[in-house]
Amino acid sequence: MPTSVAIIGAGFSGTLTAIHLARTPATDSSIDIYLIDPRGSFGPGLAYSPPSERFKLNVRAKAMGAFPDDVEGFYRWERERYPNTSPDDFCPRSHYGEYLSDLLNKAVGQAHGHTLHRLTDEVIGIDRNADSGKWAVSLKSGDTITVDGCVIAIGNLMNASTTSAQSTIRFREPFNPKSYDDISKSQTVFILGSGLTAVDTILECEARGFTGTYTILSRHGRFPRPHESLPSSAVAHLPENWNTCGSVRALDEP
């Protein structure tokens, strides 16, 4: 196993990678874990550090545990801090960011001789030495760290058309708290896409007293549908030890 790993990006994926490395049983060598993020926030990332608690998760609390063997972990964490939470609640995204940060802190406290270095910096280059196989990670601060392994966890990047829009002064990043500060209450707000983030954006604008017009452009022209319970009749036809592939095959059978 590598004795040093750089993780670029400290959102959900980067944070969970760091947690799993910190949980690795002790061997002959400990692991130096470098978790690097320019935001200085380790855990929430962009998705779970929205401008207000009006931005909600799109999965119920009881199913948002970070680990597959503990799917109710987040719900227990939430109940300890917010006792009125029910298993079926859609909790604020910011709460999930706090949960991830707590998991990281706990993993570091229980690390098996491994060390986590949290670096508030931006990675500007990665080069691999052909002879040693090690990675040189160049940082905006001017520092360079040399590691045995490198994980790129920079999130879901914007597509080319959205990236080009960022250069205009009217572009707003929906998860940036400052994005809504200078929007006139009577302006027209154009929203590209009609998914859950579009709904979050509208709710945030409404809460800030927006009285203007929303123009929404979407390929399918539909808002998200509400979650529905699976009919008991459908469950009855599933095999006892079902999985996704097996269910698809069963549906294909005449």
Locate the predicted segments by residue.
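Helical element adjacent to the flavin cofactor pocket in flavoenzyme catalytic cores
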Residues: 97-117
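Rossmann-like dinucleotide-binding core of oxidoreductases
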Residues: 7, 11-41, 151-254
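General small-molecule cofactor/ligand-binding pocket signal
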Residues: 117-119, 215
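Core beta-strand elements of the Rossmann-like FAD/NAD(P) dinucleotide-binding domain
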Residues: 140-149, 184
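Generic recognition of long tandem-repeat/solenoid scaffolds
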Residues: 135-139
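A conserved short coil-to-beta-strand element within the FAD-binding core of flavoproteins
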Residues: 119-133
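Extreme N-terminal starter segment of soluble prokaryotic enzymes
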Residues: 1-5
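Glycine-rich active-site loop/strand segments that organize a redox cofactor
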Residues: 36-102, 217-254
